Design a protein with these regions (language model features):
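Amphipathic alpha-helical interaction/assembly segments
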Residues: 37-60, 97-162
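Small-residue-rich helix-loop
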Residues: 1-101, 136, 158
């Protein structure tokens, strides 16, 4: 009995954002399902994902102003393991993609708090799934030729079945 209890996977939101930045789609979806099953608050999960998106934007903006990477990390409040992940994904993200992701995080925030949006799922966890998939798509896509970065689109409502 004790070994069965010890084998139960525990998911945490910090590992979720690391998996998102690593582009590990299957792991991210499994972790989201696990967090939901464990009763984690959707608002807390959203906060961590949105904070990661905001951090990417802050660091990208600081780099765009010509600041060195360590200064950009300090200004973006990015420390530890996330620095290595940010270094990998920042070259993949255009400014307009980050602006779109910030907007998507804002829409998802509303959905998680009970607001409806015509292009987003009504269920908070489905909206979170949509948001993390947008971010995973952005960080897993190879860079486009300069000036031609792909635009992420909210598109039609994403319906995922477990």
């Amino acid at each position: 009995m004790e070994s069965a209890v010890l084998n139960v996977a525990r998911y945490d939101v910090f590992k979720l954002t690391e998996a998102v930045l690593a582009g590990q789609t299957a792991r991210v979806l499994r972790m989201l399902d696990g967090l939901r099953a464990e009763g984690e608050a959707a608002v807390l999960v959203h906060w961590h994902v949105a904070d990661t998106i905001a951090g990417l934007k802050r660091v990208k903006d600081a780099l765009g102003q010509g600041k060195p990477l360590p200064v950009a990390f300090n200004e973006g409040r990015v420390w530890g393991v996330k620095q290595r992940l940010y270094e990998r994904v920042l070259p993949l993200l255009a400014e307009h993609q980050l602006a779109h992701l910030v907007e998507a995080a804002s829409i998802c925030d509303g959905v998680v708090k009970g607001l409806k949006h015509p292009l987003w799922p009504l269920d908070p966890w489905d909206a979170l799934r949509h948001l993390v998939l947008l971010l995973v798509q952005a960080v897993a896509t190879p860079p486009a030729p300069r000036g031609k970065a792909p635009m992420l689109r909210a598109g039609p409502r994403l319906v995922l079945q477990a």
